[in-house]
Each structure stands twice: as C-alpha cells, then as structure tokens.
C-alpha cells in the first residue's frame, strides 16, 4: 500500500534527514512538507518539487536530489486544506521545528494543524494510523507535542487519539547546517538547496537515528533505517550529556582561541582535552547511571562511541563553523542542558567535571561581554530562575567561578589545565 509522509518545518533536519530517508526508502508515494516562508514554497514549486542536499562523508562531499515533494503553506487559505488532508492520510509525520516552544505558535499552530488532521482520521477508520516523530531537541518533545495536540481536541477525541496516533521521541546525532554565503557555496562546490538559489544545506552522512518502540497494532514503518528502543531516555542523555556536551565544550574553547571551523581543532591540543572530558566526565557519569541498560554504557563501547563522534565532529567536509556551534549560550547554560546538566550528572555520580566547568566558563564569558555589569550568580539566576530546589547550584557556580580564573591562561596552553 502506498504511504504518505508529512514534514512540519523544512530546515536541515527535515530536508536532510526525514524527507531524504523517506525518499530514499522508496516506500512513500507522497512526500509533503509544511513551510511558512512564501519564497521557499514558491522556489520549490518552480523546481517542480525538488531540492538538493550536500552530504559530508569521511572522504568527501556527495549531493543527493530529493524529488516529487509537495509543499504547502499553512498560512495560505488555498494550501491549508490540502495540508490537512495530507496529515489525515499520512502514515508517518515528523516535526522538525526550532524548539518545542513552536508547537503552539502561529495561526494555525503546528499542534492545531495536527489536531485538525487527526480529527479526520478519528472520523474515518479507513484512514491509516500514524507515527509522529518529534525531532525537536528536548528529551520529552513527543509528550509535549502530544499534550499540545490533545489540548486542541474535545474529551471524546482525546480518549481515542492514542489508538490511532503514536508520538515518539527521537535521538538525532546528526550534524547539519545551512551555508548562506554564496561565496562559500561556490568555493566548496556545494549544490544549492534549490537550483535557482544561493544557499546550500550541508549535513553529515549519518542516519543511525534512535526512536521509541512503535506500539501501534500492525504498524510497519516506511522509514526503515531508524532503530527502536524500549527505553529511549538513557540514549537521549548520552546524546545531550555526551555528544552535545563535548561538541559545545569544543566549540566554546575553540572560540577562545579564535578558531573559525571545528575541523581546525584536529591539529591542536584541544582535541585530546575534549576527548578526556567526553570519556571521563560524560562517560564516567553516564556509564555509572545506566550500567547494565545497554552495551553503549560500558567502557569499551563508550570509547568507540567517543572516537566515532569526535571523528565526525572534525570532519573537514562538514565545514562546521565554531560560531554556529556556540550560538545561543543562554540556552546551552540551562540547568538541564548540555554543560550544566553534565556537571550536575557528574556531581550526582561523585565525579569531577573540571573540563566542562571550563566550557561553561567560556560560555559565561561570552554572555558577560554583552552584560558587563552582571555577576555570574545574577547571570545564572536570570537563566535558571528560582533556586530554592537546586541543591547543587552553589557547587556548580563555584566550579565555574574557579574555571573562569583558569580560562585566562587557556588561550596559551590547554594541557597545563
């Protein structure tokens, strides 16, 4: 039976992962995407529903064309009903929005669009059941999206929704980005996203994506390459407190040394410094917390995981810019986010986190450069909010204050720290 895939949002993860894999599978008759930027919609239509993705492999670049895409603007009165019909008939849907906060934004919001499509599904039993992949970078994205959709339905519809629709979390360790400078697109021989355009989407060649186990009766995924896990949380933590934490640490410290591209770290003493943080601080804490859950959380497998990720992080063909990696330091200094969250996890497991404290200190310095009259404590209060229940807050802030002193010498020598 021919399947339909619908994407909500059209950034690099949607275009370079979900739609790309759906197209490559050959299992979908229809590929549909929702995009609110009129110029993008018009450009894709002029390209007859096709776009290009540049894939950074270990040995070079390769381009892939995705064709047959239907693109609709939910803000357009003519497009919205076509999009709702596609949602109602879709077997697989992926949301790939900037953050979970976008679920309820816009008129209509993504949650409202999904609810309207699912309402039709509930009324017509011949329409297929649906899996919704929540690709936003939040460990509870699927639950938040489900709640946002349920809020748009009446009580009777809510009771029936779980029988027809399953929202699943995702662990997406795929690095991606948009190259906006036409000179860089030309210099690196990248294929523009749209044939007539000047921007290019560049993603790494990686599709080992983890998802929750599918529990809908008789459901067969069209995107077959994803791997199902009964308990996704340990792997979500491995990504956030391992992959994301080490990537941020490398980025913030590379910025202190005025490095432009992440692959330039490969020839410096910063790389082994980050490797030790990834192995000992992230790995030590995560392997203790999740011992026995999966082979990943053993010293041998974790070391292989670290080696693979560091190699991918410094892939020169990915052309990953340091300023992209360190964007939005306020979010990355969040209480549960990659830097502070990893430090807290290490404290919980009675381990040190001096290297991640240095990365957090570098992120703090970026913020204080624009807010010079603010103390570190006040800065974190503005990021974290009320501190009454945060028993580790003083210890965390103390480690970062100490790391700020060490950071002054970091530009000269990494190994002495």
Regions found by a protein language model. Name each.
Residues 1-417:
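Substrate/ligand-engaging "lid" and interaction regions
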């Amino acid at each position: 039976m021919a399947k339909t895939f619908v994407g909500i949002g059209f950034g690099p993860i949607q275009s370079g992962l979900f739609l790309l894999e759906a197209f490559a599978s050959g299992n979908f008759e229809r590929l549909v995407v929702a995009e609110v930027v009129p110029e993008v919609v018009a450009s894709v239509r002029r390209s007859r529903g096709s776009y290009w993705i540049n894939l950074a492999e270990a040995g070079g670049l390769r381009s892939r064309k995705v064709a047959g895409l239907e693109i609709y603007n939910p803000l357009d009165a003519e497009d919205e009903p076509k999009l709702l019909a596609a949602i109602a008939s879709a077997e697989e849907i992926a949301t790939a929005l900037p953050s979970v906060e976008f679920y309820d934004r816009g008129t209509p919001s993504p949650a409202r669009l999904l609810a309207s499509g699912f309402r039709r599904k509930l009324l017509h039993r011949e329409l297929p059941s649906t899996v919704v992949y929540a690709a936003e970078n939040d460990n509870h994205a699927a639950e938040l999206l489900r709640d946002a959709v349920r809020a748009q339905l009446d009580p009777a519809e809510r009771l029936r929704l779980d029988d027809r629709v399953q929202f699943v979390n995702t662990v997406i360790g795929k690095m991606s980005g948009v190259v906006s400078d036409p000179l860089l697109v030309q210099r690196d021989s990248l294929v523009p996203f749209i044939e007539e355009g000047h921007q290019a989407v560049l993603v790494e060649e990686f599709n080992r994506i983890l998802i929750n186990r599918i529990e809908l009766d008789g459901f067969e995924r069209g995107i077959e390459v994803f791997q199902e896990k009964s308990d996704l949380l340990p792997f979500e933590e491995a990504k956030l407190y391992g992959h994301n934490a080490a990537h941020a640490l490398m980025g913030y410290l590379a910025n202190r040394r005025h490095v432009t591209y992440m692959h330039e770290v490969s020839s410096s003493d910063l790389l082994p410094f980050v490797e030790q943080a990834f192995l000992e601080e992230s790995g030590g804490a995560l392997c203790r917390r999740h011992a026995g859950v999966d082979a990943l959380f053993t010293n041998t497998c974790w070391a292989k995981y670290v080696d693979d990720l560091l190699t991918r992080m410094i892939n020169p063909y990915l052309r990953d810019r340091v300023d992209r990696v360190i964007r939005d330091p306020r979010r990355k200094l969040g209480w549960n986010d990659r830097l502070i969250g990893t430090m807290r996890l290490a404290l919980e497991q009675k381990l040190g986190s001096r290297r991640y404290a240095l990365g957090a200190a570098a992120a703090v310095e970026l913020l204080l450069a624009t807010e010079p009259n603010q103390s570190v404590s006040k800065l974190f209060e503005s990021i974290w909010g009320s501190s009454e229940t945060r028993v580790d807050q003083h210890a965390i802030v103390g480690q970062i204050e100490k790391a700020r002193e060490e950071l002054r010498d970091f530009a000269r020598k990494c190994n002495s720290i």
